[in-house]
């Protein structure tokens, strides 16, 4: 499982700045998608080929008893309990405060690995700063400047070092597509899981991963193997009752990251909520294949169905790549078609795309609609090849590609997805410009 890094600390020590620094490499991928709402308290980051999840808690006051500060502290407590590593941010310019001491005492009792991060350390004597915060009793502090990026890469490498690389974890399993079933509480996720698995089929075993291992549950439907990625507590035999389900954003995000295909469950009786859109946005952000299951379809009338379709068209327009299915998890209606789309989305996400055909498709797109000029230069797209899968990544080489507008990128995405029938998976396009080595010479 990809490590979960939780940022804690009192207000105004730079948690949000560090969060943005840790997640910026992935944020840019979908920031321009129309209609996409984003919860800025969580995100994904990457260093080299290592992915990780980052959670930004609000200013943490462990002794707050009521009001909004108490609610913020309660939410931070849940994040701390589910963290693999805690980054305890303190302010190097302000020095150690009684509030820092209170948080440190709380974190010592939490039983999670903690790294003390001294932020705003630019221009300060690192040895003096480290000595001041060493007294917190949480190990040697690490000084950084989140605003300037100084020391951040070393911090991430230190944090990720104890965790196995992604390929080591994935090598431990070979049981078909990894499927995560996600959604907000009481939409029917547990009913769908039980319908897919059957009580007698639940076989749980730990995948090697972090200190809080995921559970992989293999199951078979229609003669095909699948693996359900479970981080939400489906660890015992028997039914998992929706009434006792406890929604956890972090566990949902972890399941999405571990999956090849995500099934997002919606409730036909309810309008699309911000939480639904946030989960869908994170699926897109991570590049996972997606199938949307509209549950309890049999329990609503035609008026409600029409209203829901309008609501989805407005709030989930950024999921145009995904298939939507009307199902009844309780009656097991629509399940076969749902799994067929899971198979199709997985196949699309893992597609091998030939370089000659990619290049021909790109050239046909340019002939139909050339990229707009930027200043005096018109971009020239020369050839394309595949750069990755799950999601498929297409790398385009050429000249003057640094300022391709987002609208043209989306045009290319649609063209490639239609040409290669990539239904069910998002697509990434990367541009590689051949820079003129003589451009800066007199």
UniProtKB/Swiss-Prot annotation:
GTP 2 binds at residues 183-190, 230-234, 295-298. Keywords: GTP-binding, Nucleotide-binding, Repeat, Ribosome biogenesis. GTP 1 binds at residues 9-16, 56-60, 119-122. Residues 3-167, 177-350 form the EngA-type G domain. Residues 351-435 form the KH-like domain. GO terms for molecular function: ATP hydrolysis activity; GTP binding; ribosome binding. It comes from the Bacteria. GTPase that plays an essential role in the late steps of ribosome biogenesis. Belongs to the TRAFAC class TrmE-Era-EngA-EngB-Septin-like GTPase superfamily. EngA (Der) GTPase family. This is GTPase Der. It comes from Azoarcus sp. (strain BH72).
């Amino acid at each position: 499982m990809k490590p979960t890094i939780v940022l804690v600390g009192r207000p105004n020590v730079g948690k949000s700045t560090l969060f943005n620094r840790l997640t910026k490499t992935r944020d840019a991928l979908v920031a321009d998608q129309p209609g996409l709402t984003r919860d800025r308290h969580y995100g994904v980051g990457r260093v080299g080929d290592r992915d990780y999840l980052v959670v930004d808690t609000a200013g943490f006051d462990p002794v707050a008893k009521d009001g909004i500060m108490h609610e913020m502290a309660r939410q931070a407590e849940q994040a701390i309990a589910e963290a693999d590593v805690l980054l305890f941010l303190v302010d190097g310019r302000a020095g150690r405060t009684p509030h820092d001491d209170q948080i440190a005492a709380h974190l010592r009792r939490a039983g999670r690995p903690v790294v003390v991060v001294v932020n705003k350390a630019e221009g300060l004597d690192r040895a003096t700063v480290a000595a001041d915060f060493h007294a917190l009793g949480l190990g040697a502090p690490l000084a950084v400047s989140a605003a300037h990026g100084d020391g951040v890469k070393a911090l991430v490498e230190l944090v990720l070092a104890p965790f196995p690389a992604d390929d080591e974890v994935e090598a431990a399993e070979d049981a078909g597509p990894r499927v995560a079933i996600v959604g907000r509480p009481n939409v029917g996720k547990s009913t769908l899981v039980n319908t897919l698995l059957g009580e007698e089929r639940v076989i749980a075993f730990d995948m090697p991963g972090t200190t809080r291992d995921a559970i992989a549950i293999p199951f078979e439907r229609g003669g095909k193997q699948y693996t359900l990625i479970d981080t939400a507590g489906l660890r015992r035999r028997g039914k998992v009752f929706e009434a006792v389900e406890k929604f956890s954003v972090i566990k949902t995000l972890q399941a999405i990251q571990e999956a090849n295909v995500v099934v997002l469950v919606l409730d036909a009786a309810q309008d699309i909520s911000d939480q639904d859109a946030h989960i869908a946005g994170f699926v897109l952000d991570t590049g996972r294949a997606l199938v949307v299951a509209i549950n309890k379809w049999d329990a609503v009338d035609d008026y409600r169905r029409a209203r829901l379709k309008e609501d989805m068209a407005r709030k989930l327009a950024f999921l145009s790549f995904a298939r939507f299915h009307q199902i009844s998890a309780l009656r097991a209606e629509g399940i076969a078609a749902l799994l067929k789309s899971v198979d199709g989305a997985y196949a699309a996400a893992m597609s091998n795309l030939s370089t000659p055909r990619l290049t021909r498709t790109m050239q046909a797109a340019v002939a139909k609609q050339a990229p707009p000029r930027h200043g005096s230069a018109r971009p020239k797209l020369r050839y394309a090849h595949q750069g990755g899968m799950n999601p498929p990544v297409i790398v385009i080489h050429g000249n003057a590609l640094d300022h391709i507008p987002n609208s043209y990128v989306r045009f290319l995405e649609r063209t490639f997805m239609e040409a290669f029938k990539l239904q069910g998976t998002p697509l990434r396009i990367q541009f590689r410009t051949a820079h003129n080595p003589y451009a800066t010479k007199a």
